[in-house]
């Protein structure tokens, strides 16, 4: 794509969106924290595999970009009207999925492979923390998912937090700051006024790969992902809580495919 042409097309799209509000996030989703908390709680308590997830910003940008390239090439008018995604590679987006989400190396081949994997995993989502307008480009894949406003995924907004479902369970947490989480959990009774926000459970942790800082332990992001899957397979757990950048969504889908709740 010629750089000048890309600038002009994006300019027209921006003007169109400004006057029509077509780029706003206006999906129907649950905004009441009590109802949202009950939805999550009930899902976690029915003892069936489930996946509660959200998209990262840079990851979804890259996936959307890939979908535009694959399915919507040269659809100028639809692009301007924000009906289809950008159909040429966004160089800034490729940089950001590396610098902000730790995906490496951010080649178009690797990002294409990542996008295909993410799109394949999307139908496994049962509840989606919704916040990005680009979600509309994946309405078919997400048709099964109930949507709640992203912020109220956090349990502390509800008087009856969904985290009470964790009580007396084996809880696996995958996060780069695993040791800090263990130390904080030891002080759990001092952290919140409502004890149901962080009840007693058996805490198991896996230190996630932190590839934002140029971790060279693995040849690529996919190798790091496979290593974390293998670490998960070594653990007996009931529910998994994951917070590890671009690795999070695929690991959650893997846990669900293994008949777990995440």
Question: Which residue ranges define each predicted feature?
Answer:
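A short, hydrophobic secondary-structure junction motif
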Residues: 201-205, 230-238
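Short, catalytically relevant binding-site loops at active-site mouths
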Residues: 178-181, 210-213, 247-248
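Glycine-rich anion-binding loop/nest that anchors nucleotide
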Residues: 175, 237-251
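Conserved small/polar residues in nucleotide/adenosyl-binding loops
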Residues: 259-262
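A short, acidic, amphipathic alpha-helical segment used as a generic capping/interface helix at domain edges
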Residues: 35-39, 111-113, 223-235, 247-249
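Glycine-rich phosphate-binding "P-loop"
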Residues: 141-147, 204-227
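Electropositive, gly/pro-rich neighborhoods at or near active sites that engage anionic ligands
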Residues: 3-200
């Amino acid at each position: 794509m010629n750089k000048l042409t890309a600038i002009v097309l994006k300019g027209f799209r921006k003007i169109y969106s400004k006057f029509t509000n077509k780029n706003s996030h206006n999906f129907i989703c649950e905004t009441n924290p009590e109802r949202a908390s009950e939805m999550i709680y009930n899902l976690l308590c029915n003892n069936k595999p489930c996946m509660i997830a959200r998209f990262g910003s840079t990851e979804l940008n890259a996936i959307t970009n890939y979908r535009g390239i694959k399915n919507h090439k040269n659809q100028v008018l639809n692009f301007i009207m924000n009906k289809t995604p950008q159909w040429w590679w966004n160089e800034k987006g490729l940089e950001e999925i590396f610098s902000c989400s730790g995906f490496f190396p951010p080649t178009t081949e690797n990002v294409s492979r990542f996008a295909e994997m993410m799109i394949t995993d999307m139908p496994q989502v049962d509840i989606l923390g919704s916040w990005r307008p680009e979600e509309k480009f994946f309405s078919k894949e997400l048709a099964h998912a109930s949507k709640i406003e992203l912020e109220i995924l956090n349990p502390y907004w509800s008087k009856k937090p969904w985290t009470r479902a964790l009580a007396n369970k084996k809880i696996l947490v995958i996060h780069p700051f695993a040791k800090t989480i263990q130390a904080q959990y030891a002080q759990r009774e001092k952290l919140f006024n409502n004890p149901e926000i962080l009840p007693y459970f058996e805490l198991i942790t896996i230190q996630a790969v932190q590839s934002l800082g140029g971790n060279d332990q693995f040849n690529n992001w996919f190798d790091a992902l496979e290593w974390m899957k293998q670490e998960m397979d070594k653990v007996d757990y009931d529910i998994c809580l994951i917070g590890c950048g671009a690795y999070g969504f695929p690991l959650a889908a893997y846990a669900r495919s293994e008949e777990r709740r995440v």
